[in-house]
Amino acid sequence: MSKRVLTSVAWPYANGPRHIGHVAGFGVPSDVFARYQRMIGNDVLMVSGTDEHGTPLLVQADKENTTVRELADRYNRIIVEDLVGLGLSYDLFTRTTTRNHYAIVQELFRGLNENGYMLKQTTRGAVSPSTGRTLPDRYIEGTCPLCGATDARGDQCDNCGNQLDPADLIDPRSKINGETPEFVDTEHFMLDLPALAEALEEWLKGRNDWRPNVLKFSLNLLKDIRPRAMSRDIDWGVPVPIEGWQDNNAKKLYVWFDAVVGYLSASIEWAWRTGDPEAWRKWWNDPEAVSYYFMGKDNITFHSQIWPGEMLGYAGKGSKGGEQGELGELNLPTEVVSSEFLTMSGSKFSSSKGVVIYVRDFLKEFGPDALRYFIAVAGPENTDTDFTWDEFVRRINSELANEWGNLVNRTASMAHKNFGEIPQPGEFTAEDQALLDEAKQAYTVVGDALQLSKFKAGMTEAMRIAARANQYIAAQEPWKLAKDETQRERLATVLYVALQVVSDVNTLMTPYLPFSAQKVFETLGGEGIWAAQPEIVEVKDESPYTPVGVGLPEEGSSYPVIMGNYTEQKAIWQRTELAPGTALSKPKPLFQKLDPELAETGPEWAPVVKD
């Protein structure tokens, strides 16, 4: 029986183009997962968008001498184009500066406030002395007062896992310009997390299938849980929908309060854009539906504490009780899938320091599947990993081109040359049957890995089967059989077995490498869409949903979204038995080998930096 699977993907900031470190964390893993879920017959809703509020955009707008809205519009479009180029199969990729998003965010806030989970408190806020602008928690660094780590942030210390306030830090400094912030009294709405702690703990203790590091970190957060500010002294963001606050342009909702609501607001937008305004409830209100959230490790707290806390409070599930809001009881995350960090030649990605590889540049030179493959086999799934051009060239040449691409090309070429079609096999030998059985069993092995978000393990098994097929061909020597007319039936059998395994491995790799999977499908005589791709759709900003928002963006502006029709694709997670007599297409090389010199120099737009 099929399930409804919500795939919620972290929202990239629209303050610049995205680099490969970003998509290694939130992009490719979530897409591999969603594509696999569709192939096994589940009803997937994959949503995200650009995060367009908060200080990062204000800072970048100042640097570029433009308005923050113009900046958001520009980078929203660039990011949309890049993610489509990478083949990320969103059902809807939208943005946070829409009328719909504002209205849904404010509905959540009002529900929390009415249930008593929003506290008005005076706190100490950090301000930049040179600009007078509020500094958000994450833009302040200093020494942790609890463990002594010198790189603690104003919201938490990654070294010891404790929550912090900026004023807690020893020797605090601004990440923007290094100056010491001033701390002033300011009034804010605080999410009463202590009143939600028991409900959060009960939920977390039932998450036994999470990655151990994510679960341990999330449970540790509860040990020092405290109210957390959900408004900010800032003039760019979602208005606070409370009388006396909603018209105050100097105070807006915290960017992380509204960003996590984006998964819900995007689902609601998708529903009415596809003609069924209530369809989102199938993924959010049905307790049988499941939800998976993909992000980098620095965002775990917002997805295992803040967002679940917001949903619990909105439903009246904390210690203060309360009434359920009109959006209903919202499903808590089934799993929070966190990736570690990808670095570049040992350094953190940094646009300002030139340590960066932008997605757009990468796609233009190497194509999407090369990047998707590298992230799958060498990405930061469980530990921080390093991107080097040397490792990239080695992986592409020895694995993707030599092992997989060569298998496809030589098998299809021999079959096309000698038969022009899928040949009719004779009786299988023990060696033939062993390889066929092994390839068929791999559907279970790879599928189990993908269900648990173990992407490296899944690709490793698929490549192992490809290697076995290459060994089989080397042992059977079909090029010799082709020279002996009496071995015609054996040649047909060997090539049939090899082609069937190529088809199997191609299916196993479809979630990872959808672009090349389509080519292999067509080479084997397939017609139609094997692996569907997303597309860009221009839409108007409208908000037909019922919650009444305040201070909404102007109606009618246009913006690009990513959508796609993935229901008609032919890819399914099972062996497709090849039909003898099916015409083969003349194969073309699947992957080009890279110049070995690239490993030493890097491309012109991202050269290797010599010590």
Curated annotation (Swiss-Prot):
Pfam families, alphabetized: Anticodon_3, tRNA-synt_1g
EC annotation from Swiss-Prot or TrEMBL: 6.1.1.10
'HIGH' region, short sequence motif: residues: 12-22
Reactions the enzyme catalyzes: tRNA(Met) + L-methionine + ATP = L-methionyl-tRNA(Met) + AMP + diphosphate
SUPFAM superfamilies named in the record: Anticodon-binding domain of a subclass of class I aminoacyl-tRNA synthetases, Methionyl-tRNA synthetase (MetRS), Zn-domain, Nucleotidylyl transferase
Record: residues binding ATP: 351
InterPro entries linked: Anticodon_Met, Met-tRNA_ligase_1, Met-tRNA_synth, Methionyl/Leucyl_tRNA_Synth, MetRS_core, MetRS_Zn, Rossmann-like_a/b/a_fold, tRNAsynth_Ia_anticodon-bd
Keywords recorded for this protein, A-Z: Aminoacyl-tRNA synthetase, ATP-binding, Cytoplasm, Ligase, Metal-binding, Nucleotide-binding, Protein biosynthesis, Zinc
Domain of life: Bacteria
Localization terms from the record: Cytoplasm
Motif 'KMSKS' region, residue numbers: 348-352
GO molecular function, one term: methionine-tRNA ligase activity
Cofactor binding, note field: Binds 1 zinc ion per subunit.
Transmembrane portions of the chain: none
GO CC list: cytosol
Cofactor list: Zn(2+)
A biological-process GO annotation: methionyl-tRNA aminoacylation
Amino-acid positions noted as binding Zn(2+) in the UniProt annotation, renumbered to this chain: 144, 147, 157, 160
Major localisation: cytoplasm
Subunit structure: Monomer.
NCBIfam families hit by this protein: metG
Family: Belongs to the class-I aminoacyl-tRNA synthetase family. MetG type 1 subfamily.
Function: Is required not only for elongation of protein synthesis but also for the initiation of all mRNA translation through initiator tRNA(fMet) aminoacylation.
Protein name: Methionine--tRNA ligase
Organism lineage: Bacteria, Bacillati, Actinomycetota, Actinomycetes, Mycobacteriales
